[in-house]
Amino acid sequence: MRSITAILSVFVLLLVCFSASGAAVENTNPVLNFEVISSDWAPFALPVYGDVRQGETDYYTYYVPSGATTLEVSLTWDVSNGDALRLLVHPPTGASSSFGDGMDGTINGKIAVRTSIPVTMTASNWRFDVIGLTVDDVTSYTLKINSY
């Protein structure tokens, strides 16, 4: 029993330390609490395909309908050549939230987040920025946005 408790204690300590290390998530919006998701859970979203170069930003607008309570966003790309992208989420009011690869504990070319939507932020446009942080020439990506 002691060994199981010790193993669990070490696991929790590592989880807390790993979660605190690195600034992959910068949520400056006190109203929205984003949850990191480790699977590609957005099969019903119509994907948006794009290409981005180093220092370039692609902008997307998404209308969140009235009555929606949840927002899910997924950004995926190929990291085999070391390309790094960043996702910025701009709600209709308040500060934006910034997300980078590795939030789920793995550098895998995937940023996937979910948040509850306050009723005051529905029936409005949200903006999503895909930023080429470190890109060798050009990298292709897929962006999926769902609200329900």
Q: How should each PLM-predicted stretch be described?
A:
Residues 1-28, 128:
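Secretory targeting signatures
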Residues 2, 8, 18-20, 37-38, ...:
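Intrinsically disordered, low-complexity segments enriched in Ser/Pro/Gly/Ala and basic residues
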Residues 5, 11, 21-23, 40, ...:
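Serine/proline-rich low-complexity intrinsically disordered segments, especially terminal tails, linkers
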Residues 22-70, 146-148:
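Non-catalytic extracellular/lumenal accessory regions of secreted precursors
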Residues 51-102, 122-124:
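Acidic, Ser/Thr/Pro-rich low-complexity intrinsically disordered segments
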Residues 86-148:
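Noncatalytic accessory or regulatory domains flanking protease catalytic cores in secreted, cell-surface
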